[in-house]
Amino acid sequence: SLAHIILSLDAGARNYLKLFSSDIDRTHGHVKEIFVNNPLTELGRQDIITQMEGIDQAVISLLVRIRMDKGISTIDSTHSLLLSEMKKLNIPIIIFSFGSPYLPSYNTVETYVCTYNYGSITMQAAADVLWGRSDVNGSLPVNLNSKYLRGFGILKKKRNNGWGQRLQINFPDAWGVLDSAIENKIFPGAQVFIA
């Protein structure tokens, strides 16, 4: 199963990330969403770690909005501690940064996608990258540390198949049901969309 954890000190984070969260839930289903928008105590971090029992993979969304005179350009230190503790769980974790890309440490990060924004177009693009619906071709416009320098990026082609092989979809029963329903005038017609 999948967990989606949103970490931010911004009061509007859940609303800003609504499109991304909705796409995750709609695409995967049965997603455990955890929203954290305050600093975490040790007990709070342990509670989240406990909630990860039975979780096979996690998507973590970070939202740090850099605003004038706020003095914050990275995630809260207790959120960084949570990331360190989650790495020890040995489950695949992908982190999406919406807003500021800076972290106190990148040692706990397995997969990191920086979007620099939290608008609707960015949310859709992030969801498309997560599910392999579009190519990944971005590169860093800034230096994050001595390892991840400006221009660094990983190129990845979109998925056009399922689980390593071309999709061979055959719906003879579905067509039969539709034809029968139309013939019996249950409904006047049908449209079929396969994504």
Model-found features: residue ranges?
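C-terminal non-catalytic regions of proteins with extracellular/luminal or membrane-system context
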Residues: 1-166
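Short amphipathic alpha-helical segments
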Residues: 171-179
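A short, well-structured edge-of-sheet supersecondary motif
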Residues: 179-195
